[in-house]
Amino acid sequence: MKSRSDASESIAAFPKNSDICDMEVFFAHEADGRFCRLDADESGHCCRVLRHRAGDKINVIDGIGTMYRCRLVDDNPKGAEAEVLETFPGWGGHPYRLTVACCPTKNNDRFEWFVEKATEVGVDRIVPLIGDRSERKVYKTDRALRIALSATKQSLKARIPQIDEPVSAKDFLRHSETAEQAKESLKLIAYCFEGDTKRISIQEALRAYGGRDITVLIGPEGDFSPEEARLAVNQGYIPVHLGSSRLRTETAAVIATTAVYLRYE
């Protein structure tokens, strides 16, 4: 994966009179390195709403890490096509790989807010967990995927985070590598452990880690069950706290994402 400095060099390569704050980005459902093709939604926004015409230069992402500087050759609002002029691999990327496994909130809007903000900050994979104490036992990812795409474009990134289908917390943990198997990764669980279990701050855990592969577990409104917490620790997850405030699930997930982002800035 490209580093943030690589991404900065890519952005700097644009013409000096372009204003990155007002930069428009479109998503290509098909990109082969020579041409980018937009689906009906993106084409309509590009050609009907923003009134781009053949010959205009546009910026297109492929959703898997590359941004293309293109010239529009077909301004059909139902299926636009653009010729690739320049390629910027790793555009808007970050020098870490972050998975946030988080229990969806009872209120869908709150979890979708997390998806949006985590995407803007920098997350690679979101896993909706169904915990023993989850109030929401079913979660559909369709809308979250659309929100992630919009946030990816808004935050000037080229890679859309992967959003998994929901899985039970215990199944996710059982299939998680043990600490011995995954020495290169850092696995953290934010949980209000009782008794003598020691928790360190997430900042301390990140400072002590020299790698780039991180997974963070965030529980539901009622937190993980003791059984889930024990299973996580047995699988090599380090107990951490996110500060002294009591946080909503979605707030905790965004703070954890931000802590990782700032660690590698």
Positions of PLM-derived features:
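RNA substrate-binding interface of SAM-dependent RNA methyltransferases
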Residues: P89-I189
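N-terminal positively charged helical leader segments and presequences
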Residues: M1-G90
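Generic structural signal for residues in well-ordered beta-strands
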Residues: A82, I160-D164, P239
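N-terminal-biased segments
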Residues: R48-E81, K170-L206
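Structured adenosyl-cofactor binding patch, chiefly the S-adenosyl-L-methionine
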Residues: P226-E265
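Active-site/ligand-binding-proximal alpha/beta "capping" segment
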Residues: K187-R230, Y237-L242
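Short, ordered loop/turn segments at secondary-structure junctions
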Residues: T87, G131-S134, E221, S244-S245
